[in-house]
Amino acid sequence: MPKDVVDPPYPGSTATAREVLDLAKVYQATALTLFDASTGRGMEAARPAHLCALQAIELALNAWRRHMGEPFGTIRSRGHDLSCPIPAAALGLRHATTAHLVALTGRREYLRVRYDPTLSEGWSHRTRITATMNEVVSKVSLRFNPTCVAPARTAAPPTARRPTG
């Protein structure tokens, strides 16, 4: 490429945290629809739903990281690592969900579901991946909703009165 030509920005690098979260919700809805459509048709039929669920999880965690001010380049350098403990702790994820995020990364599940045509086992059951996806997207969404933040107290709470008599 000639020196005077500037590379276009990496796709998504200019997206806001809210836009990334909105995209995660699109993938979440699609995953749920595809899981419903694949019921009773075996694991292979659920592969697209599984991939959408993994993408929804990753996007929601990335939205949280963007919301917290993490630079896009740092987020991108993580690849598909969902196991970072900081968002899990900050979001108040359940232990089972946090352990599942670590397992997803350890098994390289995103890459296996996406690229391995022979994959027939060793990936998360649909109820586990759906529970993880729903919890992550839900808890990230709660952190974006300003009505969920408790207002600061400006005065001391009233003291309790003792009953007389």
Positions of predicted regions on the chain:
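Short, hydrophobic, well-ordered secondary-structure elements
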Residues: 46-66
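An amphipathic alpha-helix/helix-turn recognition signal
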Residues: 19, 26, 44, 48-51
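Helix-loop segments that flank and shape redox-cofactor active sites
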Residues: 32-47
